[in-house]
Structures are given as structure tokens and as C-alpha cells.
Amino acid sequence: MGQALGCIQVDQSNVAIKETFGKFDEVLEPGCHCLPWCLGSQVAGHLSLRVQQLDVRCETKTKDNVFVTVVASIQYRALAESAQDAFYKLSNTRNQIQAYVFDVIRASVPKLDLDSTFEQKNDIAKTVETELEKAMSHYGYEIVQTLIVDIEPDVHVKRAMNEINAASRMREAASEKAEAEKILQIKRAEGEAESKYLSGMGIARQRQAIVDGLRNSVLAFSESVPGTSSKDVMDMVLVTQYFDTLKEIGASSKSNSVFIPHGPGAVRDIASQIRDGLLQGNSAAE
């Protein structure tokens, strides 16, 4: 109705392209405008100045021959001061942007291996944005921001990557477990060594106490019973220890059966053997 009366409304964040007899005349700002249609004035079309978003999926191959799908998100808008170029120079803005994105991604990703592609996705996005900005500025468009939102490897490659990561985790866990067992064994060995050391110290003190006791017993008996020699006292002590040993073996419930001579003559022989062994040991030491 308004156009029939020669008036037109342009909404906010939009501009209208005015033509006179098919030739560009001016860009109409938001508001109400009079168009004398009888003089050949008309609106050729409207152009939105809002930020628009285009998601582009580009399949390409990395340097290590892995096929990936790179998903790029392009945010762009038409410039009000270049509305004429934006309206007339491009017939399909989205297809044009998509073509530039394909070109830049397929030129950048094949230079990188798969891991580097993930690590340098911000650099790829910056390269795409720079190239798009140079190209689209000639057509009256501004590239607001470019994001690489996803990098999708082939399904089989993704499964293999997950298996590699799982194997790496298991290897680390096994290494940590082995290290823990190693530390445990070291600590156990240190504990056993300390235990044996303390046990040895106890045995040494026990034997020293026995030697001291025997020496005192021999001296006391020799002084109490005149006419006895040290040899007689040692024979008696050895016989006493012999019977004490038999008593301990018989008293223990876990002892094995031990068959040894235990008559008086056998005791004398054992005492003689022990005494001779001590004398030989002393001679060897001297």
C-alpha cells in the first residue's frame, strides 16, 4: 500500500537499494522514504546489516595421510558504507565464502600432521579469517570472526587413537604398579636386613652372656671344691648343657625326632669331641 502511494519503510539493521529506471541511485537508511514510482524510482532489494553465521564442513587430508573433516564457523556482515558492492557484486554470498574457506583449509591442513592439526587449529582459523577478510572486503563484507569448532578424523582413525590412548594409560598404570612393588620389595628387604642385624646382635649378646656365665661358674666351682681342675669343671658343664639340650628338644611340640647317643660313655665321647674342637680352634687362631 505504501509503495503504491510512493512510500517505503526500511527496518532497523537493514538498508534498501534504490534504483531509477534500473540504475543504482542510492542506499536508503532505516526509516520511511518516498519513491515517486512514476519517475522510475523503485526498490531493487533489501540488505541485512546483522551479523550472520555460516558453518562450513570441509573434508581434507593431513600430512600423514589421515582424512579429517574440519568444521569452520564464519561470522560475517555487510558494511553499510559498502552496501552497493555487497548487493551488486555477489550473487550468492554464502557460496562465495564457502569456496574461500575450502581453498584455505585444503591449502593449510595438508602441511600438518594429525596431532599438529589439533594443536594449531587456532592458527588455521586465523589464516582462514585473514584470507577471507582480504577477499570479501572487495565485495562490501566484513569477517567478524572465524572459528575452527571441530576436527573430526575418520571413524577408524578415531577408534585407533582411542585404543592407543587406552594402551598408553595401561602402560603407565603397569609402570606405576611395578614401581610400587619395587619400593615394597626394597622396604621389605631393608626390614629383613634390620631384623637380621638386630637378631645377630641379640645372639652375640646371648653367647657373650653364656661365656661370661661359664667362666664365672668354672672359677667359682674351682675355688669351692679343692683339687678340681678346669678340665673337670668343663666336662661337668658340657654334660649339663648336653642334658639341657635333650630336655629342650623333648619339651618342644614342634621338634623333629633326634636320635643321638645318650649313655655315660657317649656323653664322655661328646665332651671329648667338643673339648678337642675348642682346642683345635684355639690352636688355629694362634
From Swiss-Prot:
Q: In this entry, which stretches build a coiled coil?
A: 156-190
InterPro entries in the record, alphabetically?
A: Band7/mec-2_domain, Band_7, Band_7/SPFH_dom_sf
Entries under Pfam families matching the protein:
Band_7
Membrane topology of the entry: Lipid-anchor
Q: What GO terms fall under cellular component here?
A: mitochondrion; plant-type vacuole; plant-type vacuole membrane; plasma membrane; plasmodesma
Q: Which PANTHER family match?
A: HYPERSENSITIVE-INDUCED RESPONSE PROTEIN 2, STOMATIN-LIKE PROTEIN 2, MITOCHONDRIAL
Q: What name does UniProt use for this protein?
A: Hypersensitive-induced response protein 2
Q: Which organism is it from?
A: Arabidopsis thaliana (Mouse-ear cress)
